[in-house]
C-alpha cells in the first residue's frame, strides 16, 4: 500500500506518546514493504522534505498565528484566536490538497489533527481517498485535547468547547474508519455522537522501546521503599494529589518524581513537598528510572487515553497504582498487576500507597504478574499486524459504512 500519515508533529519533534506510536507504526510498516510518507506541521513557511530514519517526511509551515511548539506561551486572547482558526483551517486544507495531488496515496492515516483541523478530512475526501482516523486524545471534543480545566476533569463539554467543536461530530461521519488506542478513547467519542457511520476498531499501543527483561529472581525491598512518578509535571497528572496523600500517610518510604514542567508549577509542587522524603529528580530515561523504584504511581486526575507509562512500568515488573480515569484500567487490573484509586475518593490513593508499603507479599505478587499481564500489548509486531488488517479492510470496503464496532485487538 502507498500510505500517507498525517500528524501534528513527527520525530524529532515529540509532543508525547502519540508521536512515539506514529513513528513506530510508520517505520514498522515501511519495513514490511509499504510505501510510506509522513506529513506534519513545522515552524517554517512552505513545505520542506527530509528523510528521518529512512522515512520520507514533509513538514508544512503552520498557517495559523503561531506554531505552538516553539517553547513560548502566548497570551490567552492570542491562544483563543489560534483555536478559533483551528476549528476549520482552510489554509492547511489547501496544503494537504496539494500534497495529495502530488503523491496520490492509496489511503491516508490521520493521527493528531491539531494544526490541520478537521479540514484535513475534507481535503482527503475531495481527493477521493479513504480515511483512517486514529484517536489519541480528546481534540475532537476539546481544543486542549484533554477535557481538563481549572484543576478538574470536565464531565460535560463546556460552552466554549461546544462552540469550537459544533460541527465536528457531523463531519466525522464521513470518516471511513476510526481506531481508538483504548476502548475508553473510542467509546468517549462514539458516545458523544462521533463516527456514526465509520468502521470502528480498538488497537492498543505497543511499547516499542522496552527491551526484554527477565523477572528479578528475588525482590529485595529497599529501605525506605521507593514509590515513583514519571511524566509531565502538569496539573492533570495528579502530582499534587500524590504528594498530599503520600505525606499524609507518613510511610517508611520515599517518593521520587521525574519529569519536567513549567517552572512556576514545578516550584509550586516543590513547595508542597517535604524534601526529606519527596525527591524531584528532573527529566529521566524511563528505563533507568523504573530500575530505581519499587512501585510506580500514575495518579492522573484528567483522563488518560491510554497511559503508556503504566504499560512501561508493568513491562519492568513493577506493581502500578493507577487512577480509574480513562484507559489506565485497561492496562492495570486491580489486584492483578496493581491497584486502583479514584480522584472521587481522594484517600483511596493514600490507602493504596499504604497497602503496598506494608504488605510485602502483595507487592511481590503484583510485581510477579506485571509483565506477563501486558505481554501481548508490548509487541510492535502485534500492533502492526492489527493496523495492517484495518488498512486492508478499509481499502476493501471503500464506500461501505458500518456502525458496529469490530474489536481487532487480540487483547
Which residue ranges define each predicted feature?
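Conserved acidic donor-binding segment of nucleotide-sugar-dependent glycosyltransferases
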Residues: 283, 334-335, 339-347, 355-361
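Carbohydrate-associated surface elements
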Residues: 184, 206
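Membrane-proximal helix-turn-helix segments that form the acceptor-binding/catalytic region
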Residues: 139, 155-178, 187-188, 192
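A short, well-ordered alpha-helix in the C-terminal region of glycosyltransferases
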Residues: 348, 355, 362-389
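Short hydrophobic beta-strand element within catalytic cores of glycosyltransferases
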Residues: 319-322
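Glycosyltransferase donor-sugar binding loop
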Residues: 230, 254-267
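Nucleotide-activated donor-binding/catalytic signature segment of Leloir-type glycosyltransferases, i.e.
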Residues: 266-284
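A conserved mid-protein helix/loop that constitutes part of the nucleotide-sugar donor-binding site
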Residues: 20, 225, 229-248, 347
Amino acid at each position: 500500500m502507498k500510505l500517507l500519515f498525517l500528524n501534528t508533529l513527527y520525530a524529532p519533534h515529540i509532543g508525547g506518546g502519540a508521536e512515539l506510536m506514529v513513528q513506530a507504526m510508520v517505520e514498522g510498516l515501511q519495513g514490511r514493504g509499504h510505501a510510506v510518507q509522513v506529513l506534519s506541521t513545522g515552524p517554517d513557511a512552505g513545505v520542506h522534505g527530509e528523510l528521518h530514519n529512512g522515512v520520507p517526511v514533509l513538514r508544512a509551515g503552520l498557517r495559523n498565528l503561531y506554531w505552538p511548539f516553539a517553547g513560548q506561551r502566548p497570551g490567552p486572547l492570542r491562544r483563543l484566536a489560534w483555536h478559533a482558526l483551528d476549528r476549520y483551517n482552510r489554509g492547511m486544507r489547501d496544503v494537504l490538497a496539494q500534497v495529495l495531488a502530488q503523491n496520490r496515496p492509496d489511503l491516508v492515516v490521520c493521527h493528531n489533527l491539531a494544526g490541520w483541523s478537521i479540514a484535513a478530512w475534507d481535503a482527503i475526501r475531495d481527493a477521493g481517498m479513504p480515511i483512517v482516523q486514529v484517536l489519541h486524545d480528546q481534540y475532537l471534543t476539546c481544543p486542549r485535547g484533554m477535557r481538563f480545566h481549572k484543576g478538574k476533569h470536565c464531565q460535560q463539554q463546556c460552552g466554549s468547547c461546544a462552540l469550537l467543536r459544533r460541527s465536528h461530530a457531523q463531519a466525522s461521519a464521513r470518516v471511513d474508519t476510526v481506531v481508538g488506542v483504548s476502548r475508553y478513547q473510542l467509546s468517549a467519542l462514539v458516545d458523544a455522537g462521533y463516527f456514526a457511520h465509520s468502521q470502528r476498531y480498538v488497537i492498543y499501543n505497543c511499547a516499542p522501546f522496552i527491551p526484554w527483561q527477565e523477572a528479578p529472581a528475588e525482590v529485595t525491598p529497599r529501605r525506605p521503599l521507593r514509590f515513583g512518578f514519571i511524566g509531565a509535571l502538569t496539573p492533570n497528572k495528579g502530582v499534587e494529589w500524590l504528594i498530599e496523600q503520600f505525606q499524609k500517610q507518613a510511610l517508611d518510604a520515599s517518593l521520587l518524581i521525574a519529569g519536567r514542567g513549567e517552572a512556576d508549577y514545578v516550584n509550586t509542587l516543590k513547595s508542597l513537598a517535604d524534601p526529606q522524603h519527596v525527591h524531584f529528580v528532573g527529566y529521566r530515561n524511563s528505563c533507568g528510572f523504573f530500575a530505581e523504584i519499587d512501585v510506580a504511581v500514575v495518579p492522573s486526575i484528567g483522563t488518560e487515553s491510554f497511559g503508556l507509562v503504566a504499560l512501561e512500568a508493568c513491562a519492568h515488573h513493577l506493581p502500578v497504582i493507577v487512577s480509574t480515569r480513562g484507559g489506565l484500567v485497561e492496562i492495570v487490573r486491580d489486584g492483578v498487576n496493581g491497584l486502583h484509586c479514584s480522584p472521587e475518593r481522594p484517600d483511596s490513593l493514600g490507602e493504596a500507597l499504604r497497602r503496598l508499603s506494608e504488605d510485602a507479599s502483595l507487592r511481590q505478587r503484583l510485581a510477579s504478574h506485571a509483565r506477563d499481564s501486558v505481554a501481548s500489548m508490548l509487541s510492535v509486531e502485534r500492533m502492526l499486524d492489527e493496523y495492517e488488517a484495518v488498512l486492508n479492510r478499509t481499502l476493501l470496503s471503500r464506500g461501505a459504512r458500518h456502525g458496529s464496532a469490530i474489536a481487532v485487538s487480540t487483547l
